[in-house]
Design a protein with these regions (language model features):
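Conserved helicase NTPase motor core
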Residues: 5-16, 20-24, 55-56, 63-64, ...
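P-loop NTPase Walker
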Residues: 1-106, 110, 117, 183, ...
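ATP-hydrolysis module of ASCE/P-loop NTPase motor domains
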Residues: 79-82, 100-190, 213, 275-277, ...
Length: 434
């Protein structure tokens, strides 16, 4: 039982329940990641499960890497055979092997948002639609929402009914998909969408993965959308040893398509499911937890849980209201300066803000008061122009059908090739059926 030593009673219960559906309601700071990694170790060490037969799905590459490292430390040899992945990474691996079974090319390119905008821009020209009424950002969001609901263009058209705008969105979606196929490209939503298509049309492929994954764990289940729900249901349809971990109280991604009812209705989807609540918090003071419990208890339709801790009471919570963002920034910076005068190094202080546009006023106040600061975040490495250009060259080498990448780098470095020449090349390619 060394795999679960040091865990509290509820954590041990969650780790040792291995057969059948399991919902772990993990409150904030309750040791969720620790439970998942120790549960994997328990399956391998105590239940003699082959690591090859275990799948753990997380939402970010960072979380996946952290989980791999933790499992490796606990299990040691053999841990590398556990499939720890994000939804999208898992689907890429599956499609690289089997996408040709449903008419795709396994050497597809994955388009990011900027690539999608380039495709939508051409689609709007083709359909003679006003970009002011149908912005690239809006079109991408509508297409993404449709794919997250596992809706094809025809499904969207049928749903549109007599709505002129919705009918145009369906046409944009249809033309977008046509161009994506011509470019041998998939967007991030396609990775899950096409995997669902593959499993639906090729039951032998689905069966192979169901036979491989005897034990499936899904982290942050409250953040899953409908297509991710369908994917999990497909994979768990064989052995039915599905463990999902999440907290409906932490569901904040509805604007990204997350469906909170995936976790709220888990017991309806799996009537024989066991539920384990992790309510002991290791991160916060009791003052913070009492305030959080008081606020979240007003939510309707939530799964009841009450976080508690053995930690100290801690300082009182200070809540300040300001007239506007300028007074707020002034109040925040004044407090930082006061803390510094009381002996707290600036390096030990941080300002958290909800949206990027809030930083401007805060930065102005910091500069005015000669407070040195460092911004955490900024432009992602792969979003830098020179990196994107280089990646597009590599994409063209790997996938000659990738028109978006070709258009981006045809004049990088400058070769005197203008829009007229590019349009002639594009027209000639269309005539040649390229």
């Amino acid at each position: 039982m060394s795999s679960i030593l040091g865990l509290n009673d509820k954590q041990m219960e969650a780790c040792s329940y291995t057969e059948g559906p399991l919902l772990i309601l993990a409150g904030a700071g309750s040791g969720k990641t620790r439970v998942i990694t120790h549960r994997i170790a328990y399956l391998i060490d105590e239940k003699s499960v082959n690591p090859y037969n275990i799948l753990a799905i997380t939402f970010t590459n960072k979380a996946a890497n952290e989980m791999r490292e933790r499992v490796d430390k606990i299990v040691g040899e053999g841990a590398e055979y556990v499939w720890v992945s994000t939804f999208h990474s898992m689907c890429v691996r599956i499609l690289r092997r089997f996408y040709d079974r449903i008419g795709g090319d396994t050497h597809f390119t994955i388009y990011d948002t900027d690539d999608q905008k380039a495709v939508v821009k051409e689609v709007l020209k083709t359909l003679n639609l006003d970009p002011k009424q149908y912005s690239e950002k809006m079109c991408i969001k509508e297409i993404s929402s449709a794919k997250e609901e596992f809706l094809h263009p025809d499904d969207l058209a049928a749903r549109a009914g007599t709505s002129y705008r919705e009918a145009n969105i369906a046409n944009i979606y249809r033309e977008y998909e046509k161009r994506m196929r011509q470019n041998n490209a998939l967007d991030f939503d396609d990775l899950i969408f096409q995997t669902l298509e593959l499993f639906g049309k090729c039951p032998d492929v689905l069966h192979a993965y169901q036979e491989r994954f005897h034990y499936i764990m899904v982290d942050e289940y409250q953040d899953t959308n409908h297509s991710q729900f369908l994917l999990v249901r497909y994979l768990a349809g064989g052995q039915k040893n599905l463990c999902v971990v999440g907290d409906d109280d932490q569901s904040i991604y509805k604007f990204r398509g997350a469906n909170i009812y995936n976790i709220l209705n888990f017991e309806q989807e799996y009537p024989d499911a066991k539920v384990v609540k992790l309510e002991q918090n290791y991160r916060s003071t009791s003052t913070i937890l009492n305030a959080a419990n008081a606020v979240i208890s007003n939510n309707k339709g939530r799964k009841q849980k009450k976080l508690w801790t053995e930690n100290e009471e801690g300082n009182s919570i200070i809540f300040n209201e300001y007239q506007d963002e300028y007074h707020e920034a002034e109040g925040v910076v004044d407090q930082l300066i006061q803390n510094h005068r009381n002996g707290v190094p600036f390096a030990d202080m941080a300002i958290l803000y909800r949206t990027n546009n809030q930083s401007r006023v805060l930065e102005e106040k910091l500069v005015m008061n000669n407070v040195a600061y460092k911004m955490v975040g900024g432009t992602n490495f792969y979003q830098r122009k020179e990196i994107r250009d280089l990646v597009c060259y590599l994409k063209c080498i790997s996938n000659p059908s990738d028109e978006v990448s070709f258009t981006r780098i045809i004049n990088v470095p400058r070769r005197g090739i203008g829009a007229t020449t590019i349009n002639k090349i594009r027209d000639e390619a269309a005539m040649q059926g390229c």
